[in-house]
């Protein structure tokens, strides 16, 4: 294999290792819960990486982040395992 091919292979392996979460859960599960910046009261759930459990919180209806789920089952399937 040529040195260019080896460099390409090494680059692809590095990229794959960087983008593949170690635990198998999406990286957004590690985000802190964010209620957002509007004024609605939407019952939601977020994953707590320190306790490895899902908890309820109130979402404001806009903004926030991807660590937000409509049901505790969806949170558990996505982030707990």
UniProtKB/Swiss-Prot annotation:
SUPFAM superfamilies: BPTI-like. The record marks 39-40 as: Reactive bond for chymotrypsin. Residues 1-24 form the signal peptide. Its main location: secreted. It is found in: Secreted. Glycans are attached at residue 76. Belongs to the venom Kunitz-type family. Serine protease inhibitor that inhibits chymotrypsin (Ki=25 nM). Also interacts with vasopressin V2 receptor (V2R/AVPR2). Inhibits vasopressin binding human V2R in the nanomolar range (Ki=112 nM), and also moderately inhibits vasopressin-induced cAMP production (IC(50)=138 nM). In vivo, intraperitoneal injection of this protein into rats increases diuresis by 2.2-fold, without any loss of electrolytes. This is Kunitz-type serine protease inhibitor NACI. The keyword GTP-binding does not apply. The keyword RNA-binding does not apply. InterPro entries: Kunitz_BPTI, Kunitz_BPTI_sf, Prtase_inh_Kunz-CS, TFPI/VKTCI-like. Expressed by the venom gland. One of its GO terms (molecular function) is toxin activity. It comes from the Eukaryota. GO terms for cellular component: extracellular region. Residues 29-79 form the BPTI/Kunitz inhibitor domain.
């Amino acid at each position: 294999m040529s040195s260019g091919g080896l460099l390409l292979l090494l680059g692809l392996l590095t990229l794959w290792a960087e983008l593949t979460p170690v635990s198998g859960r999406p990286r957004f599960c590690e985000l802190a819960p964010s209620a957002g910046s509007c004024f609605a009261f939407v019952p939601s759930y977020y994953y707590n990486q320190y306790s490895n459990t899902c908890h309820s919180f109130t979402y404001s209806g806009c903004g926030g982040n991807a660590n937000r789920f409509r049901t505790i089952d969806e949170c558990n399937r996505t982030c707990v395992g």
